A protein has these predicted regions:
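Tryptophan-centric aromatic hotspots in well-structured domains and transmembrane helices
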Residues: 74-75
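An amphipathic, aromatic/His-enriched active-site/gating alpha helix that lines ligand/cofactor pockets
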Residues: 78-108
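Short S/T/G/P-rich N-terminal loop/turn motif that feeds into the first structured element of a domain
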Residues: 1-68, 83, 106-166
Length: 166
């Protein structure tokens, strides 16, 4: 008989741990090319080891037809994640996606060890099936108190200014 080993992660050294899932879904050939373009750029950015990024996992396949791919990241704390999102190259990707969606939908879901969960879905009404939290929870516009991830997580402090204004 094979002995089974059972472990768990000791997260006591990570009191502010953040886990974020990110994904894009192509709705057109142009969207497929956008997916192919962003992959190497993300790999280059995470290989630069941004401060606070503990681990990056890619190649989560939600579907092949239509292409819907994602990744998961572990961050030391929300401030580190927020700082990275307000700098290049992430800031440029976000501005570009908001200005020119290029036939893709994007979503992310953020989970805090302290208990908060937040999400944002761009062009989610174009999804054939509603991903993640939208599969069971109603959607609301990301405005006002729901505009930034910091606000959606109900974290204290001003944080960094958003990449785009409301």
């Amino acid at each position: 008989m094979i002995a089974i080993s059972r472990q768990t992660a000791d997260l006591s050294g990570y009191p502010d741990l953040i886990v974020i899932y990110l994904a894009m879904k192509a709705h057109s050939l142009r969207g497929f090319w956008a997916l192919l373009k962003i992959g190497p750029a993300i790999k280059k950015a995470v290989n630069a080891q941004p401060d606070g990024l503990l681990h990056h996992e890619e190649n989560i396949v939600y579907s092949l037809f239509p292409p819907h791919f994602g990744m998961r990241q572990y961050w030391r704390d929300f401030d580190s994640l927020e700082k990275w999102t307000r700098e290049m190259p992430h800031m440029g990707w976000w501005k570009d996606l908001l200005a020119r969606p290029q036939g893709v939908s994007f979503w992310h879901e953020t989970y805090s060890i302290r208990g908060g969960i937040e999400s944002v879905f761009l062009a989610s009404r174009d999804f054939d099936s509603r991903p993640g939290l939208l599969a069971f929870a109603p959607d609301v516009d990301a405005k006002g108190s729901m505009f930034s991830a910091r606000r959606r997580l109900q974290l204290q402090g001003e944080g960094r200014p958003p990449v785009v204004s409301e």
